[in-house]
Amino acid sequence: MRDSSTPVRETVEHHLVSDGFRAAIPALRQSYQQNDFAEIPAFMPDEIFRSTLQELQDLFDGQSRRRDTNIEQSGCTPRRFTTLARDNIANGSSTIPAVFESSALRAALEEIVDEKVLPVPYEPEQYIATRLHEPGDVHGWHWDDYTWALVWIFKMPDENNGGSLEYVKDVPWDPTNPRVKEYVTAGPVTRRHPSAGSAYLLKAGTTLHRVSPLTYAAQRMMVCFSFASVTDLKSKHDHESIQALF
């Protein structure tokens, strides 16, 4: 693993306990309680964002894998994008592991969701990265294995070019009978288009969601951190979807 230097960790922790960050928590809590979604503007300081973006670009240039497949457990919905696995990120980024391991981050998330927030026990799903960049690239409808996804956005296309988060909240996932078309048709489908530099928290285990297709070449680059609830740790997860993609 690449060394997550003490200055980086200290900067991350200091930002997450700063008055400015904490001042946003009541509004984030309200958004999450109403929508199972909360967008955190300026998730990290500019210097951290810029250095992490450079790390990601280098990793995508040298260690990424292109995927073009359908995932059976989510109704054979498509995945067309480029991926970075957790271990590639851990070995090539100083910041992303520090963010995932931050006790201040988990404490802030617990205030937002009003539950205990835990690191996921399955290491390959702790954090991953994807890049949509070709026309037709899409991260099709799916649920996550664990309760929460925290998605840090590094590049985002114009809203009229796709790349938006679309979701239907409060729907169960049965991998043997996912009923994706039924849930999407019944809706309501909520659309969000977060900006680069922001992060969003989604109750992804009970929210059917996708990243809408790109209509022309552009970039949507993100890192997804997964966090577990106490209930998650008592449940079995087969991890077939994550294994197929990363």
What residue ranges belong to the model's regions?
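Glycine-/proline-rich flexible loop or hinge segments
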Residues: 32-39, 85-95, 224
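Hydrophobic alpha-helical segments and helix pairs
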Residues: 73-112
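A generic secondary-structure signal for well-formed alpha-helical elements
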Residues: 60-64, 116, 231
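Catalytic core of Fe(II)/2-oxoglutarate
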Residues: 163, 173-246
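Hydrophobic residues positioned within well-ordered beta-strands of beta-sheet architectures
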Residues: 40, 148-150, 223
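Short beta-strand segments enriched in hydrophobic/aromatic residues
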Residues: 56, 154, 227-229
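N-terminal auxiliary "cap/dimerization" subdomain that precedes the catalytic jelly-roll/cupin core
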Residues: 1-78, 98-103, 243-246
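Catalytic core of non-heme Fe(II) oxygenases with the double-stranded beta-helix
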Residues: 110-115, 119-199, 205
